[in-house]
């Protein structure tokens, strides 16, 4: 069974919380499909090239059909010529890939389970830095001692945001923004208990 590490108000180890046993049976392919879809959706479909039907000019036949011994030329807009249209060039393609709700939920479960198995899923009752000082936020992350950390809160208040925003390799999201990709890509996850309960219940 996968276990998340519970931290007390001083961010010290204070026990464990067990994730549902069903999480162990989920296939990693669900996470692969979700990450592939998520990254594809970030692609900007701005690449565009004109075809021979769209470039300007070329209304006149450039040379006689017969007599020169060369190949037949019907238009200067052909992809064969400089200034002509492009054959099979990029169009404004839609890169989005569909992933159904069940696969999204399974991907999230798998990502949480993987972090727990690695000893990198940390649960805290509430994460608030009342002073808004980065020094205190750094002290919190030093207790976790991981290369980079995703912080998931129910609601991020202004002071806590100010404390964490300038720290390298640290990213904060609220519950509605978290997804399987973010959980999987960071080396550790610090999550509020209410959010973890909600995610495991929804998933």
Curated annotation (Swiss-Prot):
Keyword rRNA-binding listed: yes
Recorded superkingdom: Bacteria
Any one GO molecular function term: rRNA binding
GO cellular component: ribonucleoprotein complex; ribosome
Keywords: Ribonucleoprotein, Ribosomal protein, RNA-binding, rRNA-binding
A Pfam family recorded for this sequence: Ribosomal_L4
Stretches for region Disordered: 50-74
Keyword Ribosomal protein recorded: yes
GO biological process: translation
InterPro entries membership: Ribosomal_uL4 (IPR002136), Ribosomal_uL4-like (IPR013005), Ribosomal_uL4_dom_sf (IPR023574)
Subunit-level organization: Part of the 50S ribosomal subunit.
Known function: One of the primary rRNA binding proteins, this protein initially binds near the 5'-end of the 23S rRNA. It is important during the early stages of 50S assembly. It makes multiple contacts with different domains of the 23S rRNA in the assembled 50S subunit and ribosome.
Name of the protein: Large ribosomal subunit protein uL4
Species name: Aliarcobacter butzleri (strain RM4018) (Arcobacter butzleri)
Lineage of producing organism: Bacteria, Pseudomonadati, Campylobacterota, Epsilonproteobacteria, Campylobacterales
């Amino acid at each position: 069974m996968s276990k998340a590490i519970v931290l007390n108000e001083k961010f010290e180890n204070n026990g464990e919380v067990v994730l549902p046993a069903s999480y162990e049976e989920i296939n990693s392919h669900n996470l692969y499909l979700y990450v592939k879809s998520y990254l594809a959706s970030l692609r900007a479909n701005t690449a565009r090239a004109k075809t021979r039907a769209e470039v300007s000019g070329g209304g006149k036949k450039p040379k006689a059909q017969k007599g020169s011994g060369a190949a037949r030329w019907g238009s200067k807009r052909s992809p064969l010529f400089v200034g002509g249209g492009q054959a099979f060039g990029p169009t404004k393609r839609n890169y989005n890939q569909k992933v159904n709700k069940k696969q999204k939920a399974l991907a999230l479960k798998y990502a949480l389970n993987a972090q727990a198995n690695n000893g990198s899923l940390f649960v805290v009752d509430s994460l608030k830095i009342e002073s808004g000082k980065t020094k205190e936020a750094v002290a919190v992350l030093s207790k976790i001692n991981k290369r980079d950390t995703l912080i998931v809160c129910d609601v991020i208040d202004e002071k806590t945001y100010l404390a964490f925003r300038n720290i390298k390799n640290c990213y904060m999201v609220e519950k509605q923004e978290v997804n399987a990709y973010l959980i999987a890509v960071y080396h550790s996850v610090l999550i509020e208990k209410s959010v973890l309960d909600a995610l495991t219940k929804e998933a």
